[in-house]
């Protein structure tokens, strides 16, 4: 278990008034351009990133930021996005600029152009970018004297004009063009003449020169709505990635290739797990029989563990009257994420006039308000607490079409939602118990590389007393630290109603996924007037804890599919065993073996198709079937089978009763490793002699 790799923080250095930050970096003997740990910007005492050309008015201490840090890579990628935009406008002079932010592992820039970009365009653009990088153009910050000055300079850039006029988006991390108290541009200067070659509206910061971009490539292009709103113009987006060294870029590209092979959307089709029919609409998946098996196993194991942990199962409807979400505050705080209302129960006169107005009903975006109604349905005593309500509840959220992504971002989902009501005195023990339950259950599914994130109060947006927030935050911190996992702070990242712990999981490719959340809520108990009778007879508010362990079943399914590259652990696999006869005459024998396995609860098929045996082995290997049992004349005579595994190894001549017991044992142990000839132990204890198979 580990947190994301982070370079050791750099020691602060002093910048003398009237000199540049870059001079202080050089005086300190720190790495410069060309090294993976070259300093690209500095961080001031307020946490703001500054260009190396920044000149402070007084002596200040700053922290150098290296290229191989998260912030350093982000600056390099932002500068690479500018180089891309310059190349596009040189190749396509009529192109209008959108925005070009750094993103996780890369960058993009949006353009309004007459035709979509082609792969040939990307090749030509990358070549032009390499020339700009080689030229060593200087990034120079310039402050506009006024909005009018900025408008005049950017009169031919309609999207930039919109950003100038709409500074409400200044704090949006994806809108790098505006921010702070100033409107600024970054000009690219010819290093020899210092003449302006190109420029862009931008708040920065940037690397000193284009040569500080050691390694980059363009990856793809796509359509994208301006500012992510489908009511706006459709632009063309070019994606790229940039890194601190060629070695780092090569590693990233290898990871991308492997991620593409593991893409759950691709595997969902190849393995016949799920699909997204156009007739249903965007973000609304259907699970096929094989996907249904995996989903059922996920849910049933979770259900059993929840029952053992003292949870009580509930069920709630998919729609509700408007008033519930007025009470909960969702219509005030979350209306943009909800589907439009349905008006129901109106009554009309014969002439069409309304005799009785209808009521607005909503698809539920969250299960919690309905769980609060269950809690409130009768009086509660402290003796009933903690009360742990759990539901596999379907919810519906309006996601913009541009952000929908396979199973990991959908509009219709099933959440494994729990709400825990406890006393303030029980809060710490319940949180500790809950966190351990979450970690143990995720590990049972094969995800066991964790770190934690603690989201704390936004001082400008919160409900409840400071004392309660402080107590709850410190309690969460103590619980997180006692787990022994790394804890990453997320200052100001909490929702307005309480602090939370997020469990971050690293998958087989080293990618981080936010998986489970444990959220304290000081708002809902008041809104719903939730109470319990304490030991002294007084009425008190319970502490409310929200918890979604998987996030959603759909998202967890997608993450597991990619983590295992579609080769699910045997206990989750849609088909656990397939019998492959050497010839048609051996199919009946394997039917008998299959019948024994079915009686023991194993999902098994016999391939009686007309394909040759070698073809069958290839087909079922591609379908990720974990156990293949082969049988020919010698096996039938000996009452045996031969094991064939996905890594091409075999165990030949295994007595059928031993084969059945070995498979049943593997499934019952919920072993997450992929079975191989080396790992499978036969009940007799005899040593196996694995052999390499053909084909």
From Swiss-Prot:
It is found in: Cytoplasm. SUPFAM superfamilies: Class II aaRS ABD-related, Class II aaRS and biotin synthetases, ThrRS/AlaRS common domain. It catalyses: tRNA(Thr) + L-threonine + ATP = L-threonyl-tRNA(Thr) + AMP + diphosphate + H(+). It is an enzyme of class 6 (ligase). Belongs to the class-II aminoacyl-tRNA synthetase family. Keywords: Aminoacyl-tRNA synthetase, ATP-binding, Cytoplasm, Ligase, Metal-binding, Nucleotide-binding, Protein biosynthesis, RNA-binding, tRNA-binding, Zinc. PANTHER family: THREONINE--TRNA LIGASE, CHLOROPLASTIC_MITOCHONDRIAL 2, THREONINE-TRNA LIGASE. It comes from Mycolicibacterium gilvum (strain PYR-GCK) (Mycobacterium gilvum (strain PYR-GCK)). Its main location: cytoplasm. This is Threonine--tRNA ligase. Residues 263-569 are annotated as: Catalytic. Homodimer. GO terms for molecular function: ATP binding; metal ion binding; threonine-tRNA ligase activity; tRNA binding. Disulfide bonds: none annotated. NCBIfam families: thrS. Its cofactor is Zn(2+). Zn(2+) binds at residues 368, 419, 546. One of its GO terms (cellular component) is cytoplasm.
């Amino acid at each position: 278990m580990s947190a994301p790799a982070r370079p050791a923080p750099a020691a602060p250095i002093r910048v003398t008034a009237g000199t540049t930050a870059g001079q202080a970096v050089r005086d300190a003997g720190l790495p410069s351009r060309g090294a993976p740990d070259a300093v690209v910007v500095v961080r001031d005492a307020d946490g703001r990133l500054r260009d190396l050309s920044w000149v402070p008015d007084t002596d200040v201490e700053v922290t150098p930021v290296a290229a191989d840090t998260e912030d350093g890579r982000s600056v390099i990628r932002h500068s690479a996005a500018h180089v891309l935009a310059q190349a596009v406008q040189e190749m396509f002079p009529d192109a209008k600029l959108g925005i070009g932010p750094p993103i996780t592992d890369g960058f993009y820039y949006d353009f309004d152009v007459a035709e979509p970009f082609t792969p040939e365009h990307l090749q030509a653009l990358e070549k032009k970018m390499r020339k700009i990088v080689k030229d060593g153009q200087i990034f120079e910050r310039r402050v506009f004297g006024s909005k009018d000055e900025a408008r005049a300079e950017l009169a031919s850039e309609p999207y930039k004009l919109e950003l100038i006029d709409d500074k409400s988006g200044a704090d949006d991390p994806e809108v790098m063009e505006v921010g702070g108290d100033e409107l600024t541009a970054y000009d690219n200067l010819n290093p020899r003449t210092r003449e302006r070659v190109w420029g862009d509206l931008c708040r920065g910061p940037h690397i000193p020169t284009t040569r500080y971009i050691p390694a980059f490539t363009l990856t793809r292009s796509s359509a994208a709505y301006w500012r992510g709103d489908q009511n706006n113009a459709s632009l063309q987006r070019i994606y790229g990635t940039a890194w601190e060294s060629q070695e780092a870029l090569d590693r990233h590209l290898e990871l991308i290739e492997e991620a593409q092979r593991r893409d759950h959307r691709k595997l969902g089709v190849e393995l016949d797990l799920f699909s997204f029919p156009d007739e249903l609409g965007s973000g609304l998946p259907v699970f096929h029989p094989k996907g249904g098996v995996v989903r059922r196993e996920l849910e049933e194991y979770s259900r059993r563990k929840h029952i053992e942990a003292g949870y009580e199962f509930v069920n709630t409807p998919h729609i509700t009257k408007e008033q519930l979400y007025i009470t909960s505050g969702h219509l005030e705080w979350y209306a943009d994420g909800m589907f439009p209302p349905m008006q129901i129960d109106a009554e009309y006169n014969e002439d069409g006039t309304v005799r009785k107005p209808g009521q607005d009903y909503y698809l539920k975006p969250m299960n919690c308000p309905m769980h609060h109604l269950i809690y409130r349905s009768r009086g509660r005593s402290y003796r009933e607490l903690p009360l742990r309500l759990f539901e596999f509840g379907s919810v519906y959220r309006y996601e913009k079409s541009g952000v929908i992504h396979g199973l990991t971002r959908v509009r219709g989902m099933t959440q494994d939602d729990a709400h825990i009501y406890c006393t303030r005195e029980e809060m710490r023990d319940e949180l500790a118990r809950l966190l351990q339950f979450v970690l143990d259950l995720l590990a049972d599914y094969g995800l066991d590389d964790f770190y934690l994130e603690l989201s704390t109060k936004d001082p400008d947006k919160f409900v409840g007393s400071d004392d309660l927030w402080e107590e709850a935050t410190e309690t969460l911190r103590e619980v997180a630290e006692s787990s022994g996992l790394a804890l990453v702070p997320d200052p100001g990242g909490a929702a307005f109603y309480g602090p939370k712990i997020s469990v971050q999981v690293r998958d087989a490719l080293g990618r981080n996924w936010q998986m489970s959340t444990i959220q304290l809520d000081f708002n809902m108990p008041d809104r719903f007037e939730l109470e319990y009778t304490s030991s002294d007879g007084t009425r008190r508010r319970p502490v409310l804890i929200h918890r979604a362990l998987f996030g959603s079943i759909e998202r967890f399914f997608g993450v597991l599919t990619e983590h295992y590259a579609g080769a699910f652990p045997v206990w989750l696999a849609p088909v656990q065993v397939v019998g492959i006869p050497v010839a048609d005459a051996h199919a009946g024998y394997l039917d008998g073996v299959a019948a024994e396995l079915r009686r023991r609860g194993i999902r098994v098929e016999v391939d009686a198709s007309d394909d040759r045996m070698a073809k069958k082995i290839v087909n079922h290997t591609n379908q990720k079937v974990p156990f293949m049992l082969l049988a020919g004349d010698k096996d039938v005579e000996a009452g045996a089978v031969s094991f064939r595994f996905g890594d091409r190894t075999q165990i030949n001549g295994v007595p059928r009763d031993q084969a059945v017991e070995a498979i049943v044992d593997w499934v019952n142990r919920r072993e997450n490793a992929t079975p191989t000839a080396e790992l499978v132990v036969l009940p007799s204890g005899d040593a196996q002699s694995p052999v390499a198979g053909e084909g």
